[in-house]
């Protein structure tokens, strides 16, 4: 029997693209030629969705589950922040491998739950959402997995990363290298609801300020906050340069912002790491190829997406106890932190 991988190979596209096209995912940007090629391949290979075992729930085979994905972020936010697009890719890849092709994607803003959620067996919610939104979704569905959102652990599954541990690891590395005057560049964290969003604390900023304060090193004037984008990273570093008395190092809360920040430094003939060291967050693909390769906290975002799918399928197969998966992070050492200079 043909699989999504077979169709992907036949049509020369990825399995996740096949899954989204076959499910009529209108959030996917793909040419009509590619879409037709995938549909033709599915027809030629006589593809039909596979079945999964319901498990101990009733012992019967059922058609592949109807799974929904709710993205708290707008499309614009996802495009400028690879953190969320990588999570999406992990979800889609795991669904493709499990032959779950009935995946529906929604944006939270303006979503009508009654119309969109009624035919679903379960849903994955990506991003921070308000308690009211959690309640509204749970009114229509029992099976919900949250990614990067701390929901009620007694009720819901969640996939998280330990921002506190990761931030402390990055800062301790800078301390070990002898840096004391450390600045921060980061974005605003938002809690989303159907008709908008509100700004809430960002754990990276909170932990940074607490650790620096405890060491008597916090300079609030060297904390720069904007939006999570390359452009904002550039603008905030330009602001820091104009302000003068640059810190010895910066902890920057995303690689995209760090790349923008390094561009601003380069234009002012300020060298990284000779003049200013940088440690950032995410380890996106381009981090290793930046003008100065970035030392950065690697977040296994794709694995977060994969784990969420596994947990959802496990729930649909009969597991009743809610679980919380904490995906680890890892500091990736490259040139921007100045470690090599310290050794010379």
Segments from the language model and where they lie:
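N-terminal helix-turn-helix DNA-binding module of bacterial transcription factors
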Residues: 1-58
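Alpha-helical recognition/docking segments in bacterial nutrient-uptake
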Residues: 2, 59-172, 176, 241-242, ...
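Short beta-strand segments enriched in small/hydrophobic residues
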Residues: 19, 57-77, 181-194
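Structural signal for hydrophobic
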Residues: 67, 144, 182, 275-276, ...
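Periplasmic-binding protein-like
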Residues: 68, 119-126, 183-186, 223, ...
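Hinge/beta->alpha junction and helix N-cap segments in small-molecule ligand-binding domains
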Residues: 74-85, 106-111, 159-169, 185-236, ...
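Flexible loop/turn connectors
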Residues: 238-344
């Amino acid at each position: 029997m043909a699989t999504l991988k077979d169709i992907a190979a036949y049509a020369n596209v990825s399995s996740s693209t096949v899954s989204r096209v076959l499910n009529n995912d209108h959030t996917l940007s793909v040419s009509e030629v590619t879409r037709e090629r995938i549909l033709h391949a599915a027809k030629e290979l006589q593809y039909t969705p596979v079945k999964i075992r319901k498990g101990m729930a009733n012992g019967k085979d059922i058609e592949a589950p109807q799974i929904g994905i709710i993205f708290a972020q707008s499309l614009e936010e996802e495009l400028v922040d690879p953190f969320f697009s990588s999570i999406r890719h992990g979800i889609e890849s795991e669904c493709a491998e499990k032959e779950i092709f009935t995946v529906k994607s929604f944006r939270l803003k303006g979503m009508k739950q009654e119309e969109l959620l009624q035919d679903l067996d379960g849903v994955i919610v990506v991003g921070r959402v308000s308690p009211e939104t959690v309640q509204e979704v749970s009114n229509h569905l029992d099976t919900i997995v949250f990614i990067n959102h701390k929901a009620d652990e007694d009720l819901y599954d969640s996939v998280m990363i330990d921002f506190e541990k990761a931030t402390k690891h990055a800062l301790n590395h800078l301390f070990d290298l002898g840096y004391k005057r450390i600045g921060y560049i980061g974005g605003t964290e938002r809690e989303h609801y159907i008709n908008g969003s509100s700004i809430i604390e960002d754990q990276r900023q909170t932990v940074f300020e607490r650790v620096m304060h405890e060491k008597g090193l916090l300079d609030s004037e060297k904390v720069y906050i904007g939006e999570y984008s390359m452009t904002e990273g550039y603008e905030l570093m330009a602001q820091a340069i104009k302000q003068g008395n640059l810190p010895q190092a910066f902890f920057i809360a995303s690689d995209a912002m760090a790349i923008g920040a390094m561009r601003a430094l380069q234009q002012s003939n300020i060298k990284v790491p000779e003049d200013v060291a940088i440690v950032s967050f995410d380890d996106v693909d381009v981090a290793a190829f930046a003008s100065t390769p970035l030392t950065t906290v690697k977040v296994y975002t794709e694995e977060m997406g994969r784990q969420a799918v596994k947990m959802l399928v496990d729930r649909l197969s009969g597991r009743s106890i809610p679980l919380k998966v904490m995906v680890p992070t890892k500091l990736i050492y490259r040139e921007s932190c100045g470690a090599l200079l310290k050794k010379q």
